Amino acid sequence: GFDYASDCRGTQPFMPVWQGEVIHCPQLPTTLPTLDELLGVGGLNEGNVHERLLELTVNAPPTGHIYTLHAELEGMKLLPVFEKLLTGWRAQGYTITTTRAIFASLDKAALPRCEIVRGTLPGRSGTLMLQGNPYLDRWKLAAA
């Protein structure tokens, strides 16, 4: 099996729950929008889209951010944008690392259990999987 997955959107690493069953494969969700979701929205273009992403990373969550890039965009046509992002993230104090290193640093037993749901995001065509609500939290509140 997989040690971990990074194929949904969310706010922090979590243990996914699907239809009431805990899936024992930690999820390291993408926490930031992709360039193709931002370009052309609200006046964002190749010359300024990096500024929007850097605004979103000014304050780092405790587990950091995970950014998904597309080799055919950031590695080719939008390489200058990606270089600006890397420079900006380093200036913000981030260490560029791998999802494997993030996974290795996690206390897996302490990860929140969250539902995984299908949904949509602005700028993204179709549906994708999203980190949902913490599992059973609404029942814990009702019992309190």
Features from the language model and the residues they span:
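His/Asp/Glu-enriched short active-site or ligand-binding loop at hydrolase and phosphoryl-transfer sites
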Residues: 1-18, 27-39, 93-106
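Alpha-helical scaffold elements lining the catalytic groove of polysaccharide deacetylases
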Residues: 16-61, 80
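C-terminal domain-boundary segment and adjacent tail
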Residues: 59-144
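Structural preference for beta-strand elements that scaffold enzyme active sites
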Residues: 3, 25-27, 64-68
